[in-house]
Amino acid sequence: LITFTLCLGACSEDDLDSKSIFDTEEPKMNEFDNWLMKNYVTPYNISFNYRYDDKESNMEFNLIPADYDKSIALAKMMKYVWIDVYKEVAGDEFVKMYCPRVMQLFGSPAYYPNTGSIVMGTAEGGIKVTLYNVNVIDIEHPYIDIDSPFPDKSGSTTDLNYWFFQTMHHEFTHILQQKKNYDTDFNLISAGNYRATDWINLKDPDAPKSGFVSGYASKEANEDFAEILSVYITRTEAAWQKLLAAGVVGEDESGKQAILDKLEIIREYLKGSWQIDIDELRKVVTRRSAEVATLDLTTLN
């Protein structure tokens, strides 16, 4: 009774503020937002989300926002070496029809706490692609390695092919897979060599001996498919030949042959299902990747 009386005494009749304590207003459009509207939203219905949003993140990861200026640089590069590539090779309608509707950026890399493995990007339901580690971008000296058969995966690498563009082609391959199935004979070629959870222990330079272009490709068939396609089109022919050579052990060329057999199925899939010549796609990707150094990434011109 005493406590109840004290509580009553402590109450007052202050007027309630009609304004919510939660910020429900949409952020005002800035110069970058206007550029995105013109280059992503209006022509392709792509929402390029560079602002941090908890609802768009995987709470298993400890993530930070993407830097504003580096998000601008990535948006310009992504348009040049991904959107405009498919526009040039497959046509504007292809991009409008099959591109993801949401691209979400985060500034830091995403690590699984239990395994220590890193997530380069994710594709969800053919609609959304998430890219991590945007803050690694060196705006003044953008570096896209198309000449090495195996990427530098050291923590300090600034290779944008490794972090973003091969990843984007990989994730887009998953979107295409979800739209149209590929020949299931692909799944049989390396059926006995997939490593499920143990793929993380297979180093990239050793992977070709077992018929894979990377350690991650050995996880399962869908990832194998996406890895072969994305590695092939983001590397020069010289780099690809070096990768194939790593699949030869003495007189044993079974690793190399497995990669080539799977590549042939991918080649037929792209041509038959999407009317895309994989070698023309590679030619445009590598050409545009080499031209990125000439882009002005500091302005929104």
Task: List each language-model region with its residue ranges.
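Second-shell loop/turn segments in exported
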Residues: E60-Y68, I139, F150-W163, G211-K219
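Acidic, glycine-rich loop-and-strand cores that form catalytic or ligand-binding grooves
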Residues: F165-A207
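Auxiliary, metal-adjacent structural segments of Zn-dependent hydrolase domains
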Residues: I72-V136
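Acidic/polar, low-complexity intrinsically disordered N-terminal segments immediately downstream
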Residues: S12-M97, D252, A258-N301
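Active-site recognition of the HExxH zinc-binding catalytic motif
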Residues: D145-D183, A226
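Metalloprotease/metallohydrolase-associated module, dominated by Zn2+-dependent proteases
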Residues: Y194-L281, T286-N301
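C-terminal motif of bacterial Sec signal peptides marking the signal peptidase cleavage site
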Residues: L6-A10
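Sec-exported extracytoplasmic/periplasmic mature domains
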Residues: K79, I83, K87, T173-N181, ...
